[in-house]
C-alpha cells in the first residue's frame, strides 16, 4: 500500500495541492491520504471535512488531546503524535506538508521506485525547491543565482550549515527570487536545471522534513523535536543510509519565517501554482 500523510491543514495550500493527490488517487497510485488534523482554525477544519467527503480515500486523523498552537493556528510540536497512524508493515508512507504546492509529474513515482529499490535506506528524500539544504545545492549548481545573496555552502562535519542559516529561510528577497526563478524555469522548460544526482548518503545531511518517505515496518516514531530527528538523527541511530532522489522535484511554498512577508504581498505566487496544478 501507498499512503500519503499530511499534517493539516491550511485551505489556501491544500486547495492547490489536493488536485495533484486526487489525480494520483484516481490513477491508482495512492491507497489513502491521511490528513493529520493539527489546527484550531475552524474554517480550515471545515475544509478538511469537505475533502474527506469529496474523496473516499481521504481520511481525517486526530489525537486525544487539545491542539495548542505554536505558530498561527497549528502546533508543529504535536505532529509527532500522529506517527502512530503510519506504522503498518505492508505500507510505504510519504509525508507531504500542507504547503507543498507543486510536484513535478513523475516525482511521486520516482520516490516510490527509490523506496523499493533501496530497501535498506532509512528515509527517501526528494529534491525540494525552498528547502534549506536544497537551496544551497541549487545555488552551487547554478539553478538558482546568487544575485540576491548566497546561502551557506556545505561545511564538512556541520550538519546545520544550511538549516541554521537564517538568511536561507527568512530573507524576503531570497524567497521572492526562489519563486520567481522557479516560475521562469517552468515557463521556459528548464526545470531539469534543478536536478541533482540520485545518491545514497552514509554521511548524514540535515534534510528538510516537509517531504520524506519511509517503510511502515520501521515503526518510525519521533518526539516533539521531529525536525532534527527525521532530518538525520533517526537514520543515524538506525545505522542505515538515507537516499536522495535528485530528479524528484517539488516546491515548498514557505517556512513560517517567510510566510508573513508572502501573505502581506497577497500570496501572489499561489495564483501561478494553482493555475499549473491539474
Name these PLM-found stretches:
Residues 10-29, 43-47:
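Short, well-formed alpha-helical segments that are part of the catalytic scaffolds
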Residues 95, 103-104, 122-127, 243-245:
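A structural signal for short, well-ordered beta-strand segments and their strand-loop junctions
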Residues 13, 42-45, 102-104, 131-136, ...:
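Short catalytic/ligand-binding loop motif for oxyanion handling, primarily in non-cytosolic enzymes
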Residues 3-11:
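A conserved hydrophobic helix/loop-capping motif in glycosyltransferases and polysaccharide synthases
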Residues 47-48, 107, 135-140, 255-258, ...:
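Short aromatic-enriched loop/helix-cap "lid" or pocket-rim segments at secondary-structure transitions
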Residues 35-95, 101-108:
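Active-site-proximal specificity loops/subdomain of glycosyltransferases
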Residues 107-220:
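Conserved catalytic core of nucleotide-sugar-dependent glycosyltransferases
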Residues 1, 16-17, 168-278:
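C-terminal catalytic/acceptor-binding lobe
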